[in-house]
Amino acid sequence: MRIDEGFLTPEAIARLQQEEALSDKTHKRTAQQIEAIYSSGQNILVSASAGSGKTFVMVERILDKILRGIPVDRLFISTFTVKAATELIERIEKKLHTAIAETQDYQLKAYLNDQLQALSQADIGTMDAFAQKLVHQHGYVLGISPHFRIIQDKAEQDILKREVFRQVFEDYMSQTDNKAFIQLVQNFSGRRKDSSAFREIVDSIYAFSQSTANPSSWLAEVFLRGSKTYTSFADIPDQAVDTLLACMQDTADQLRDLTDMEGYAQTTKAGKLTAKYTKHLKMIDSLYEWALHFDSLYGKARLGQLAQELTALLPSGADITVAGHKYPIFKSLQEQLVGFRHLETILAYQQESLPLLEVLQAFVISFSEAYLAAKMQENAFEFSDIAHFAIEILQQAPDIRQAYQGHYHEVMVDEYQDNNHMQERLLELLSNGHNRFMVGDIKQSIYRFRQADPQIFNQKFKDYQSNPEHGKLILLKENFRSQSEVLNVTNAVFSRLMDESLGEITYDDKHQLVAGSEAQKQLHPENRAQLLLYNTDQAQEGTEEASTNDGISAGEVTLVAKEIIRLYNEEKVAFEDITLLVSSRTRNDTIFQVFNQYGIPLVADGGQENYLKSVEVMVMLDTLRSINNPLNDYALVALMRSPMFSFDEDQLARISLQSSSQDQPQAFYDKLSNSLRGQGEHPGLIGQELMTKLVDFDRTLSDWRQFAKLHSLYELIWKVFNDRFYFDFVASQPKAEQAQANLYALAIRADQFEQSGYKGLSRFIGMIDKVLETQNDLADVEVERPKHAVNLMTIHKSKGLEFHYVFILNCDKRFAMADLQAPIILNRDEGIGIKYVANVKELLRDEKLASLKVTMETLPYQLNKQQLRLATLSEQMRLLYVAMTRAEKKVYLVGKASKEKIQAKTADNSSEGRLALASRERLLSFQDWLLAITATFSKEDLFIDVRFVDDSDLTAEAVGQLRSSGLLQADDLKDNRQTEDIARALDMLDKVSKLNASYQAAIELPTVRTPSQLKTLYEPLMDTDGVDIIDQPYHRPKSFDLPDFSKKKAVEPSQIGSSLHELMQRIPMSDQVTAGDIEQALQFVSADAEVKARIDIKKVTSFFATTELGQLLQEHHQCLHREAPFAMLKKDSLSQEQYVVRGIIDGYLLFEDRIVLFDYKTDHYQHSAELKQRYQQQMDLYAEALSQSYGIARIEKYLVLMGGSQLEVVRLDE
């Protein structure tokens, strides 16, 4: 290729596509990729599905431009992140090196070397970076010094912002006519007594405006648009009415389906329609009729009347119960009716809110101007300021704009679906109108919280699709990442979920994923997608699994651990090929705990700025706060409750009752001091154990406070670590390496704080508290990531990455919809909608009431809320798409649910192969969507298996263990700081172990033994003649088997034995024990039904009815002692040390001249002689204890044997 060779014509591109298709290349470029690489002369939008090779296309296109004589510095290339820009530059650099090596043309080599040198100076990076460069060069147009700095510390931003707010607020409050402003502040203050709630409102409006192309224009022209437009029923948009009517029809459809269910009683025994069925039929008919004939029956003007009639028609509750299951079919419609029901009243009072909104508009504009002025004075700006400056420069200076437009051959942008309107305006100004190249995928737009607007992409998609003269639309559908099992399930799910109404694009043939190679099309049935649900039916009430908690349960994580162990053991999958995806990087401790339990290495990509919220750092900060000021109740109690001192709730409650006076409240530290002196109101509550802990705590805290006066913060923190072993303690917890790094960093940051000239604990605490007050944090401490570990990251963090096996966890977590209840809701096109606090006193006509305040959702608020709800659900849908398309081989979706309820679930309504819009809007979790799809559509077409996992599947035995991967290596502790006390303790242990050898016999002798233990001890130590050979060592067998905590397991003989003993204890003894007495006693035995069923009641009855011993017990029941505890001293023959034997005797009859001792045994046996020999020593011990206690030498000993085929009572002293 010559440097000056022209760009390919459409005909040349078509020939190249044909040649590529006929070539024998292993990795062929698709026709669409070739078109995207070589097309030119107009704006181009590339809609690139997941895994379709968009980065490859961009790199090839850039290289083609360079090879055709376009220097790299004449290309504007925007990426979403700095990391993406770095990777793109590295790929271009590699391609250029390859091109240089392959060509023999010295002129081309020289040119390509020049491009390599120019690459570092080319405009390849984020929009923020380019805007800074432009303002540095041309900021003089706006009077901005080129020496400005960026305020990157959010804490600094917030401090400055608060100060500006305070000044503007005081200005408005000091005005003579401030009545409307005061009412405005009160409208948003709620129960707060300060202006903080109003400040949060202003902050949110300011932040939102900054994402627009022109903030001041948006505030002036759009901010009040909705409030001035939507003032009557006639102004309600058709879409809002259509949504209500669709919800009515969907409710009718669901109700009709429920009435057709098998468990629904349509008729009485006499064959007549039940009253419930008649009522429901009326509901169904009315809902259908009112929805279908809305225009003729009501129209917008009578929408309030429809809402009231619907309210009267529907039940007050949201559920209908069929066959014991509740179905919340009315919930969605009732939520829709809340606003419409009282809309006439709301519209009347809404007029009062407009003057307040005009004041709010003026205040936000004043604040924005004052905040910018303050930043100008500091010559320090935020990224958004710089971007707006860049836009303003290009708009105000045509010569500068034309220079950029003439310079750039092409304006390229990656991840176009995540652009906001400010960025879009900047790109428009840099382009000459027909040289834009935009790559993105609206299905992966997941940054709405950063004010990204996927509609920018969508509008261009539709425009280019309908009007090719405006630009070329290229679809990259082929996926080169995932196997067919992943592609098929993704297509099956989203073709039934995503459309223009919800998802903001219709998932049809244009967007469905297609396997890009033959290898991907090969079927692997073992990799079929799975929806794994932990069955909460068996979870005990009150447990995490049984609750409606959205958090990740231990059951969910255990089933994931089980599958990972299977993959590792059986399929030899490496840990690093497995990734867990979660919606949030917080509250994931359960995952670490369970993985720790099973030895599965796990590394979390935790993101940034979560440091001060880590538990170990919060504990240390509260420790420092307590040292600085022990009168800080919250910090002091947190310190006492922490693992350093471990005071429990009961102990803290006892201390809290030790006030010295009921008249004045006292700090918790004063109550602690009262407790120590015994001067509290209830000194009797402070026991000796608690007093000992209090003395230790008070002495330690006093020591720390004294130490803090004379030493640095660094030394103080390490003293706390050493005194209470806290640094060593966190090493035993989940995420130990990260926790220790955080604590070490706290000491380092405290040292840096003092090195910078600030001194003192008080100032350090003040600095930390100021950071926290502004809801900011410090950057997390990075630790070295293990190479071979399962990955844990958020879905947002995973975007652009790929993994062999993906587990999407916590699919049952409800979507975050808190923004729908906020005091204000902003819309880019309609402006603000608010909740207005109206005084409705005149409606009640009650002169006694001074005022009656009611919070109303104004019509603009309701309309914005509906738009926000759809936007939120659409983004959640795209999040699920991103998560599922990260998988190369297999995707697992994991959640928890009641199996019984899910199996009783009816199919949802569908339309044109998708779930009905009302159904999709009603469902509020990934799991809800997936289960609705599987219940509604043929399972064969969904390419996913739904499997419930019970507790019985998650026992330690069922989960299994990781296969051994060779010898374990010693931990590398060279970088850990070991406390001095630990070092001394290790030395002491080494010396003590040598001393122990000299007194081994006495050391190993237990202070207390039970008869059963002694029986086990005696058996190997006594020969047939009873000769003592106890000097031979006895080794107790050790077991390292994992305990089995499953619910369903086989009944153990020990359980039967324990339950039988309890039964014999509970039977009421009298002259005649009946079968009824025994059955009644069995009801009170604390055992499972399975265990009770194994007790042989016939043998128990026979014992009392047919045996001499049983008759004797009934005849002399007044002499009977049951479950009698005893204790006696014995001497060890080897060490000559005494020890205590303790035990419980099943029963004995106490007579004046003798004792009849008996014991129940359930051991299985063939000959009774076996058990006589086995239990002889144990019964002798019982007899010896009774003889010592009562001074009676004659002891008759009986074993009641119930483990054989027949009941037997044998006497041991015969």
UniProtKB/Swiss-Prot annotation:
Gene3D superfamilies: 3.90.320.10, P-loop containing nucleotide triphosphate hydrolases, PCRA, domain 4. Disulfide bonds: none annotated. It comes from the Bacteria. Its EC number is 3.1.-.-, 5.6.2.4. ATP binds at residues 48-55. Its cofactor is Mg(2+). The keyword DNA-binding applies. Residues 512-800 form the UvrD-like helicase C-terminal domain. Belongs to the helicase family. AddA subfamily. Heterodimer of AddA and AddB/RexB. This is ATP-dependent helicase/nuclease subunit A. It comes from Streptococcus equi subsp. zooepidemicus (strain H70).
